[in-house]
Amino acid sequence: QTKQVENWDKCPEDFDVANFYGGDLAGVLSKMDYLEELGVEVLYFNPLFVSASSHKYDTQDYDYIDPHFGVIVEDGGEPMPQDCCDNRQASLYKARVTNKKNLEASNQLFIKLVEEAHRRGMRVILDGVFNHCGSFNKWMDREKIYDDAEDFEPGAFATKDSPYHSYFHFQNDNAFPDNLTYEGWWGHDTLPKLNYEESPELEAYILNVAKKWVSPPYNADGWRLDVAADLGHSQEYNHLFWKKFRNVVKEANPEALILAEHYGDPKDWLQGDQWDSVMNYDAFMEPMTWFLTGMEKHSDEYKDYMLGNIENYENTMTHYMASFATSSLQCAMNQLSNHDHSRFLTRTNHKVGRAANLGTQAASEGVNKGIMKEAVVIQMTWPGAPTLYYGDE
């Protein structure tokens, strides 16, 4: 269950994966006046679709907003017993995320949020995780979430006869039932990689998802694409897919924005037929971080010679900005902080390490707000779209 935060100056509690850490669409709606007062023009949400994790980059159902973010109309069942690892016993979670009343009500709340954002002149961008899904996903259902649910087909983990068998690549097609030989993204068995080249049905489904959420009645204004260059098993297919993706999205909503998470040279995807732009790591976040803090963006390394190194800063910016067409550069996501890296303010303390080894309190020790303000001045005046991570304001 979500928690209400009463003291925003207090350091968050130590991470608890079973305790969805607060925040939902109703909360965003309640803060619309505040967001409008700040001058916010676009709300970019991390994944909102059904998922058992807090981060939700392991999608369980692409067709519905997670009821923990949306609306729980009907509740039931019990939380999973402490120290239990059998997800079949997660009856409370299963009841919430398979109940169609909860799912439909959550989608309706998202519609309301987008309508309110549009009324105030704001736009809404969704996070699309299409390279992989989660092991909880209804297509795989390794965790047996949908075993007893109505109107759901058997998952590919359980049987070769599943209608979703082709959605995944199994190294051993004779290892059913409960086939553990499916391909996981970077070897993670909780993140089954989607098998587009061998499944026209999967490709059609995801393209329909892309179209659905930027069309009435949902009317989102674009997509941010997670690990977009990893999708598929070849560069040839990757480019082909994103061309198809662009066609269906732009046909449904010509004004929709398509941004990709990408590290390295994005030129091949920014030819006007795939992505509009990218999260600007190479030509903004990284050089800004090295120049103003001397820190690597995860806080994993400090290099004294990079701090204040104007020559390196200028050369890096010039080199990587040359990879962009002007139109792509002007809408590139210029971030100082985001969900994948330490906060910029934390980097100003020059402490090397993460919460796991330093403790959460270290993130706020010895920080320099003056450096943060310098960074924001540059961010707000640099070519591109200044993008604030929730809380940095």
Language model segments and positions:
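Conserved alpha/beta catalytic core and glycan-binding cleft of carbohydrate-active enzymes
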Residues: 136, 242, 246-247, 255-392
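Active-site groove signature of glycoside hydrolases
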Residues: 128-132, 206-234, 334-338
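Acidic-and-aromatic substrate-binding clefts and catalytic sites of carbohydrate-active enzymes
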Residues: 132, 201, 230-240, 266-267
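A cross-domain feature marking catalytic cores of carbohydrate-active enzymes
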Residues: 47, 126-132, 227, 260-262, ...
